Amino acid sequence: MKIVRVTVTPIAFRDPPLLNASGIHEAFALRSIIEIESDTGYIGLGESYGDAPALAIQQQVKDQLIGLDPFNLNHLRAIVQATVAAHKPASIAGAELAPGSHASKAVSNAYSAFEVAFLDLQAHSLNVPLVDLLGGAIRDRIPFSAYLFFKYAEHIDSPYKPDSWGEALNEVQIVAQARRMIDTYGFKSIKLKAGALDPEHEVACIKALKKAFPGVPLRIDPNGNWSLETSIRMAELLGDDLQYYEDPTPGLEGMAELHTRTGLPLATNMVVTDFDEFRRSVALDSVQIVLADHHYWGGLRDTQVLAKMCQTFGLGVSMHSNSHLGISLMAMAHVAASVPNLDYACDTHYPWQEPDEEVIKGGKLPIVDGCVKIIRAPGLGLELDPDQLGKLHDQYLSCGIRQRDDVKQMQRYQPDWKTVKPRF
């Protein structure tokens, strides 16, 4: 079996005005959709970053895959490594929120984008679900958490109508957002994206959530935007309210000091983003939970390696998310299904994406009782909707965004806004 066609299609979909440590989401999120077709007629799908630096590498890699055996992942990795070495990519804007955007992650980013499509193609050719290539499913329902954000009611100079979620800047609005998430999707845990407003106010929102949803596990994620002293002060206010404390302060050393001084379980998707950082983190006891993300950890199988290392060193495992669509979510679900030590519900932005902006046939994947169910069909169990793909590609061409920049977008609201880390 040989590869005869590789297509990389950049797309854009509407993204709400969600606040974060760097600024605010732009009106559109960018992704790439990858299709790989074999000479036997099977097609594998992948979804990855759609910013210009990532796309440039993906486009260069795809031209070298024609004639390759889709089972030869070592050859794929060698092609990606050589391409990145020759390309010397620049970092993608917004990198602090998406550690996979760092130029140093270019190999793992690009390899993952194609590895998922290769594995999907392999599984189709064998007539088995993709998870069977990862050792089989330990679970077929993957738990996710309600992912809350502070947000404005609409984008400044919005190119489309406001989303249905409305403003969320105070305790009452955040509780209402959580209630809608839980009522609609059945989530059993809650995560609040923080680092955007005054820390005491964000902690007050956690307190309001605890009162409104007693017994529901809570997490807060300031994206490293609190100083060590602020993080300690907020830890004292939070007490035992949290399931885990995610990336409150920057750096491996800062996180290690915070854990020493508070004893709270710390989680990260920012200070442990590759295996070298993992080694250093273990030596320092910086974090107790690692949020995996196959998009920048080097694919589904490297994510399994990460989970095994976490098991070896007694660390918990969860999963990180960026704005994504169904191919990414289902790939995430398949690898999560194969990981024995998935200790916590995973993150997903999926509820924030509009129902008419999915690229797979059948529309958005259902989230029921807080879980995504593995599709027991060949590969990922998904097919592209060509009309929807064309629509979102046209939106990419017209939206004017080529590289995520939450700082620049925030400056449209606050002209004096600057990158400051930690801000509080």
Q: Which positions does each model-derived feature cover?
A:
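Short, acidic/polar
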Residues: I156, Y160, S164-I182, S231, ...
